[in-house]
Amino acid sequence: QAIFWHIYDPVKKGTWRSNRVKSITVSGNVITYTRHVPYPPLVLDSEFIGDCPGKGHSLELGSATVELVELVGADTVKITLDQAPSQTDHLLIGFTNTTPANNGNIYPVVCIRDSSTKVSRKVMRNGAAFPLYNWAVLERVDIDCSFTDTL
């Protein structure tokens, strides 16, 4: 889709951003972050590729545990933790899956995607064109301060 965006869509040309964290804030036991979303709104999807603990969210040092992940806007995710996280911890996105695939390997999973209506011209799934969603990318995000990604 990034190639299509850059070559064929004159309105969006040069504006592609992957589905990644744009800004983050921490208030007590709540982490709220916004994402660059190619085709809003965000979708919390645990059916298409599977579910995993915390919808793919965890804290690297384990200073708090994810209790709830919810979408609170077209580009905003709210994570409720069991307690306030350590400011030296990092939010990990995509590293909580423990379920092996059919080949026995365990792959990263994030249950957040955009609402792209684009489909593959060649790949089919259950008799229908394969959807080309933009899934959230794997990330390690500092939570020690608020930031905004301006790229």
Tell me the role of every PLM-derived stretch.
Residues 66-88:
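A surface-exposed beta-strand-loop module
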Residues 108-151:
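Short beta-strand elements
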Residues 35, 81-83, 95:
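Active-site proximal loops enriched in glycine and acidic residues that flank catalytic Cys/His/Asp
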Residues 88-95:
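Short, aromatic- and glycine-rich surface loops/edge beta-strands on solvent-exposed regions
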Residues 1-3:
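Contiguous mid-protein beta-loop-alpha structural module that forms a pocket-lining wall or clamp
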Residues 55-57, 89:
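Short beta-strand/loop motifs in extracellular/secreted proteins, especially
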Residues 5-51, 60-72:
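Surface beta-strand/loop "capping" patches
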Residues 95-113:
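Short acidic/polar inter-strand loop motif in beta-rich domains
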